[in-house]
């Protein structure tokens, strides 16, 4: 996959949905120059959430995390672009909003770690696993944005 074809999984959590922050978050990724290739709005099942957070299953907060993520709808997305995993994480800010810089999503829009409004893949490998877990291949849309030439040099 070409460098500008890297993909990441981003999910707006139930608190972000309930607070009406979906449009602002999508706008930030679009304005950065990333391309949305898949999106679905769903009530994630506990089974899906347990699989998604399997690496955290032995942590004391795991049951509460699954319950919180299951408490309302989630907006699951796949974004594509140059270094989108790393840059996406920078855009999100630190997991704990109190440690996030102004200008980041968490730094601007939330206060507590337990309500940090958004998830983003932490590595290319994690992104690939998360995308495969949440989306079927045929749900990933291939298209060339007319803005492509204005975002990338070549």
Swiss-Prot record:
Gene Ontology MF: a single term: ATP binding
Residues annotated as binding ATP: 13, 61, 89, 95, 106, 116
Biological process annotations from GO: CTP biosynthetic process; GTP biosynthetic process; regulation of apoptotic process; UTP biosynthetic process
EC number(s) on file: 2.7.4.6
Keywords attached to this entry: ATP-binding, Cytoplasm, Kinase, Magnesium, Metal-binding, Nucleotide metabolism, Nucleotide-binding, Phosphoprotein, Transferase
Catalytic activity: a 2'-deoxyribonucleoside 5'-diphosphate + ATP = a 2'-deoxyribonucleoside 5'-triphosphate + ADP; a ribonucleoside 5'-diphosphate + ATP = a ribonucleoside 5'-triphosphate + ADP
Active site, per annotation: 119
Role of this protein: Major role in the synthesis of nucleoside triphosphates other than ATP. The ATP gamma phosphate is transferred to the NDP beta phosphate via a ping-pong mechanism, using a phosphorylated active-site intermediate.
Protein name: Nucleoside diphosphate kinase A2
Species this protein is from: Xenopus laevis (African clawed frog)
């Amino acid at each position: 996959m070409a460098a500008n074809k890297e993909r990441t999984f981003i999910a707006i959590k139930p608190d972000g949905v309930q607070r009406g922050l979906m449009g602002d978050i999508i706008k930030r990724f679009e304005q950065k120059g990333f391309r949305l290739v898949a999106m679905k709005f769903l009530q994630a099942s506990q089974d899906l959430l347990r699989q998604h957070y399997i690496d955290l299953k032995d942590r004391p907060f795991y049951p509460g995390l699954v319950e919180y993520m299951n408490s309302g709808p989630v907006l699951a997305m796949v974004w594509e672009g140059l270094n989108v995993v790393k840059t996406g994480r920078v855009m999100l800010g630190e997991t704990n909003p109190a440690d996030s810089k102004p200008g980041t999503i968490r730094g601007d829009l939330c206060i507590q770690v337990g309500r940090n409004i958004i998830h983003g893949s932490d590595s290319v490998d994690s992104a690939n696993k998360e995308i495969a877990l949440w989306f079927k291949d045929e749900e990933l849309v291939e298209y060339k944005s007319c803005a492509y030439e204005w975002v990338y040099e070549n």
